[in-house]
From Swiss-Prot:
Purpose: Part of the high-affinity ATP-driven potassium transport (or Kdp) system, which catalyzes the hydrolysis of ATP coupled with the electrogenic transport of potassium into the cytoplasm. This subunit binds the periplasmic potassium ions and delivers the ions to the membrane domain of KdpB through an intramembrane tunnel.
Species, as recorded: Anaeromyxobacter dehalogenans (strain 2CP-C)
Signal sequence region: none
InterPro entries reported in the protein's UniProt record: KdpA (IPR004623)
Subunit structure: The system is composed of three essential subunits: KdpA, KdpB and KdpC.
Family in the record: Belongs to the KdpA family.
CC terms in the record's Gene Ontology section: plasma membrane
Main localization (coarse): membrane
One Gene Ontology term of the molecular function aspect: potassium ion binding
Alphabetical UniProt keywords: Cell inner membrane, Cell membrane, Ion transport, Membrane, Potassium, Potassium transport, Transmembrane, Transmembrane helix, Transport
Transmembrane segments: 3-23, 67-87, 95-115, 136-156, 181-201, 264-284, 291-311, 396-416, 436-456, 504-524, 543-563
Name used for this protein in its record: Potassium-transporting ATPase potassium-binding subunit
Cellular compartments annotated: Cell inner membrane
Length: 578
């Protein structure tokens, strides 16, 4: 691994921290429970929306009502996306004349975008009309992200509030996060991307003569798909959505044309999840809590990013055994260039891969299926940790707080004391709910992979033999059950078996985590804060950060090490010359 690669990794995380701290302070103000004041256009729009919808901005919901509102809203969004997909052939905004999306793919896509997964069993530019891309998918990118942040806000209020406090109003949280946080960020990023060359147009396609035109075929031309790309790419990155306008996602030069656009998009993957760590510290009135969680996330992500970059820069061991020179030099980037854009190279591709799988983003600027065995292992494991290393906007942090609850419970067992977190006692109910939320996605991954290995409809969709084929199955279930959305491209994901299986996995991974989190929030909201005593475990500082990291890694290792040994580990050992 070169010094330049290490410097790039250090600069990337330095820029992330510098941007996340002030954004976190702003996000904390957005998530405060005070009614909207002021005469600005956003405040007036917010109050108008509340009046139109009959929402009381001062309402304090219990956890069941908050959950019912979130589920109802998400179900309505799912049905709206499905309807637009099925009717797009008869609707305007379809200059390419694309037909209706097939029922199973439409259902899978609607579930995918409602759950913030953005798993794509279709090619964007060849399947979805402009209206569907804008009115269904881009809108859901905002709303699914806002849902995750709203649930996080409810949990944090329960931890920070007095006994008997409510969780706030889901409708108010959803509106504020969308209008005051996601829309301004996405608008700014979309303008920057358009400046860099990302299209934002209502035109269907451009036609260009090809370089291979001959006297026999002088009219040979290439049809280049266009559309409202910049607006969708901006929110797909900031909202940890990940679904690309084009089938090649951010490897496509119209989604990611320049080194600057690549940096902006990669930083945007982690920006909001990182900022929410600092918002958490501000909301609980102890900034050390936010820094502790953020440090724990970095302590996992940075080494795994280095490991991914190192694996890709070393190249394929099977080719090295044949004498292929894959060393970085002044004339070549070196490493494993299969499946990568020549303008980006293995380092930028590997940094993106680590970031997109740490967050539940899933966008790609390279083909993950073409990574080396070890280069694909670390992004796969980052997803299997539960998408809590930054994770999705809102969902990543509330997932990490579940591990924090589990960590203080384990520490309490070791010293024989009732555990506490932020002054609220952690009892059997909270531990059961946290365990359910942590285990549900993992069980879905393992059971789904087992079913795919046993049924011809499952393993028949695999495009590669041996351990790599098994890794394709494992990656697909790990991605969908943890709401990531990236994929190993060798899997035929649009078959009926896989559209149904991944759709169910996405629903379980989203709502079987969200509902226990809200149940925990309801339990904490009823509890009186307990003053810290001499035996209270401090939940800030290096000691607790280390305990939190150990808990996350222990659960991830015990759950998935056998499966990983059957896939990428064996694949790597097979490639190493004997």
């Amino acid at each position: 691994m070169t010094a330049a690669a290490l410097a790039e990794i250090a600069a990337f995380f330095g820029l992330l921290t510098a941007a996340a701290v002030p954004l976190g302070a702003y996000a904390a103000r957005v998530l405060s429970t005070a009614p909207p004041h002021g005469r600005g256009p956003v405040a007036r729009l917010e109050r108008g929306l509340y009046r139109l919808a009959g929402v009381d901005p001062a309402e304090q919901m219990g956890w069941r009502r908050y959950a019912a509102a979130a589920l109802t809203f998400n179900a309505a969004g799912l049905l709206a996306v499905f309807a637009l997909e099925r009717l797009q052939a008869a609707l305007p905004g379809n200059p390419a004349g694309l037909p209706a999306v097939s029922p199973l793919v439409a259902w899978n896509t609607a579930v995918s975008f409602a759950t913030n997964t953005n798993w794509q069993a279709y090619g964007g530019e060849s399947t979805m009309s402009h209206l569907t891309q804008m009115g269904a998918l881009t809108v859901q990118n905002f709303l699914s992200a806002a849902t995750g942040i709203s649930v996080l806000a409810a949990l944090v209020r329960a931890l920070a509030g007095p006994a008997g406090s409510g969780l706030g109003s889901f409708w108010v949280d959803l509106t504020r996060v969308t209008l005051r946080l996601l829309l301004p960020l996405a608008a700014a990023l979309a303008l920057l991307l358009a400046w860099q060359g990302v299209p934002q147009t209502s035109s269907a396609a451009a036609r260009w003569p090809t370089l291979s035109a001959t006297a026999a075929s002088p009219g040979a031309e290439q049809v280049v798909a266009l559309g409202p790309v910049a607006s969708q790419v901006a929110v797909k990155q900031l909202g940890t959505n990940g679904g690309g306008y084009f089938n090649a996602n951010s490897a496509h030069p119209y989604e990611n044309p320049t080194p600057l656009s690549n940096l902006l998009e990669a930083l945007s993957i982690l920006l909001v999840p990182a900022a929410l760590c600092f918002a958490f510290g501000a909301l609980v009135k102890d900034r050390r809590q936010g820094w502790t969680v953020y440090s724990a996330m970095l302590a996992i992500l940075v080494p795994l990013t280095v490991a991914t970059v190192s694996a890709e820069q070393r190249g394929n061991p099977a080719l090295a055994a044949l004498g292929v020179d894959a060393s970085p030099s002044a004339l070549q980037p070196g490493g494993n260039m299969e499946g990568k854009e020549a303008r980006l190279g293995p380092v930028d591709s590997a940094i993106w891969a680590a970031a997109t799988t740490a967050a539940s983003n899933g966008s790609v600027n390279a083909a993950h299926d073409s990574f080396t065995a070890l280069g694909g292992l670390w992004p796969l494991w980052l997803m299997q940790l539960g998408e809590v290393v930054f994770g999705g906007v809102g969902s990543g942090l509330y997932g990490m707080l579940l591990f924090a609850i589990l960590a203080v419970f384990l520490a309490g067992l070791m010293v024989g004391r009732t555990p506490e977190y932020l002054g609220k006692k952690v009892e059997a109910y909270e531990v059961k709910m946290a365990s359910l939320a942590i285990l549900a996605p993992s069980a879905t991954v393992l059971l789904g992979t087992a079913a795919a290995c046993l049924l011809p409809a499952g393993y028949g969709a695999v495009g590669n033999p041996g351990p790599h084929g098994f890794t394709e199955l494992l990656y697909a279930l790990s991605s969908t059950a943890n709401n990531n959305g990236s994929a190993f491209g060798g899997l035929a994901a649009s078959t009926p078996f896989w559209t149904l299986l991944t759709g169910v996995a996405m629903l379980v991974g989203r709502y079987w985590v969200m509902l226990p989190v809200l149940a925990i929030a309801g339990a904490f909201a009823r509890k009186r804060p307990v003053p810290a005593g001499p035996g209270t475990l401090p939940t800030h500082g290096p000691l607790f950060a280390g305990l939190l990291v150990a808990t996350v890694l222990l659960v991830g290792a015990l759950t998935f090490l056998p499966a990983l040994a059957l896939g990428p580990v064996i694949e790597h050992l097979q490639a190493v010359p004997r």
